Amino acid sequence: MKKKIKLVASDIDGTIIDRSNNISPKNFEAIKKIQNKKIPFAVCTGKSYSVSKGICEQFNANYGIFGNGTQIVDLKTGKELHRDILTQEDLLFVATMAKRFHYHIHIYTDTTIITERLKYMDLRNFKLKKKNGVKSLKFRIVLNIVDYIEKHKPEVFSAVITTEDTTLQEFKNLLNINDRMECTYINKRGQYRDQVINKDYEYLNITPTNIDKDQALEFLSKYLKVPRSQILAIGDNVNDLNMVKNSGVGVAVNDAYDDIKKVATYVTETKVSDGAFAEAINKYI
C-alpha cells in the first residue's frame, strides 16, 4: 500500500534535469501525474528565482524554494512567503576573502547575477539563459565586486565561490569562523562534471546561517499544514541531504552523491536521464 503523500518536493538539477540540461519525457509525465492527483509540487533549488523562473513555469510547479532555502515563493500567486539575505558585513567579508585567495565569486540578487567575469556556474547560467530564452534573469559584469558591494549595497541571497583547484575545503574552514553564514561544499568533478560548460570544478554556496532546503521545506510544511511524514522529497546533492533525510519518504536518484543515498528511504534504479524522478513518483504516488 502506497503511503499517503500530500506534498512532493524535488531538487531540479541532477534530479529532474540531467547534467547535460536535458529532461526525460517520463519526468514530464510524472509531473502531470502529480498535478492530476491535485498534490502540490514544490521545486527546491540552489539557484535564485530569476534563474529558475522559466523551468518553474514549464513544470507548472505550485511552490518554489530558491537559493537553498533563502527564498520561498508561491508560484501561482507570485507571493513571496519568506526570504533571508546575507548582511552587507558578511557579504563584504566573503567577497574580500575570495579575492584575497584569487577565487572566482559571483552573487545572486532577486533578478541579477553579479560577477567580474563569466566563468564556471555563472557562465553555465548565461549559456542556459541564451538557450532557453530566460528573460527574468540579468547579468551584471563589474570591475571590482567588493567596490560594487560597498557602493550599491545589493540584497544578496547567496554567494558562490568557485575554483578548479582542490583547496575549497580549507577555505570553507576559514569562512566558518563567521557563525552567521552557512557554507555548503559541492564537488563537480568526474561523474558530477558540469556537462553544460564541460568543466570540472568545486564550489562553496554561502547563505545566511541555519538556512537550507530542509529548513525551507519545514516552513512550507507548516504553511500548508502538511506533516513532514506525508512529504515526498527527492534529490541528488549534498544540499538535498537534510530534506531527503527528514521527510516521510526521501528518495535519492541513482546517480546521487553517496551521502544522500545513505539517508534515503529509497534509491532509484534508473538514472536521471532515464527518468529517475518518474520512477520515484510512480513508486510512491
PLM region spans:
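Conserved acidic, metal-coordinating active-site core of Asp-based
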Residues: 112-232
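Short active-site oxyanion
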Residues: 38-42, 61-62, 157-159, 229-230, ...
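Mg2+-dependent phosphoryl-transfer enzymes with acidic/Ser/Thr/Gly-rich catalytic loops
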Residues: 2-7, 23-24, 204-285
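Asp-based phosphoryl-transfer active-site loop
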Residues: 4-20, 94, 244
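Residue-level signal for inorganic ion chemistry
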Residues: 34, 45, 68, 159, ...
